[in-house]
Amino acid sequence: MVDATKFGLYDSAFEKSSCGVGFLTRKDGRQTHDLLMKGHEALCAVPHRGGMSAEGVGDGAGVSIDLSIEFFNRVTNSVLTLGEFGVGNFFLPNDPAQHDRARNLVASALKTEGMISLVTRDVEVDQSVLRPAAIKCQLPIAQWVFAAPAGIRGAELDKAIHRTLMAIEAEAYTCAELDGLYPLSMSANMQVLKGRLNSNEIIPYFLDLNELDHSIHTLYFHTRFSTNTDPHPSMAQPFRMMAHNGELNTDKKNRLSETAIARSRENKIIRPKGQSDSCRLDQTLQSRVIEDELDLVTAVVSMMPPAWENDDTLSSPVRAMLEYFSLYEEKNDGPAALIFGNGSIIGARLDRLGLRPLRSIETETYLAVMSEAGQIDFGDEPVLSRGRIEAGGMLYYDHEQKRSFGTHEALESLASQRDYSQLVKNARIEIDDLPEVSAAEYSPSSSYSGDLSLSGRYVAYSQNQECFRFMIDPMLATGTEKV
């Protein structure tokens, strides 16, 4: 069988894409069905940012939305409270004979953490909105609606759901019979719906989103496919906490770093089959928020920092914070435009290269950031501001504080939360402060006791005339590092 990811002169690692991403949120936090319709309008405005086969099959699109209280009250025939229930959406295994096993796995994992399953259902779809060739490319989505254990709320509930998710993934990603079992999302705040779709097909395809009682206050979307992967519903976006436009050119380095961190903690990272760079970024973000207990904005900034080293406009506390982040976090460099959200915070960030477009508009009712301006017609509603996110910049809305934060405000707010200057000082090791140690004391008896000539040292360190002519001599002459 031919490996389609690398054949002849073709290598999928060099694939590029120009995705469409964005978010829309009601600043008052009120859930309405109209926000879904505005999201559909935004998605219909960017078909050129999605990929489509000659037969009209989209290469991937989806939405992440907050959980609709009104809708899930009807689905469960009960009165639910936000933060006291959750929703899990799953692609089932490719082999229909394994569906019951997969359902039992999910049910068992929920029960282990004390979750109470309220409803298990298949997400209804309208195949008539798709081209005939696209129907066979879609995967059915099974949905679990579950109640939180008594007394478990907030961050503790998020951790319990995360443990449930990890238990499911540990078997789903390592058992050949369960190939295809993939959790789109499992959360007490958000749910993800996606597939091999074109942007204009998302809302009409998922019938839940067309129900008038399906009311939400936040939506973020992605159209086109994850970089460096063959089109498949599981690697379509959004992922669980973010959507990413671009490609992460530091992905290999970031994976090595994550593996090293996991090994130091005596853990093991279990990755889904064919994981894209965007999916890996989302997996890391989940780890930072749930396992390392960082708030979402801090995690995003630490993973994708601005170019701060030579920026004299940043305050000392902000510089100390970013320096501290650099001690433990490998930077994720793109080009990358990132949309992130967890139900209470929704935001957008551009990496320090700044090579992906993000346009913003704020009205009295809404805040939106999208790949292109004018994707939504807000009618006669007064516009408070329009703009764009610059390299290393961000804009997010905090529904708990009922306000938005730009780049400067966000960095200053984060820097004020801890004494990063002291943390950097505590982490720094000064060579002058180290006690003197005799080299002879630690030299093995078999070590070379003589001395190399100067030319011998050149050979030992693989230095030749080319190294001196093009690297060392210019560095000595200019005092700058040769690129």
Regions found by a protein language model. Give the residues of each.
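Conserved short alpha-helical segments that host acidic/polar catalytic motifs at enzyme active sites
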Residues: 1-483
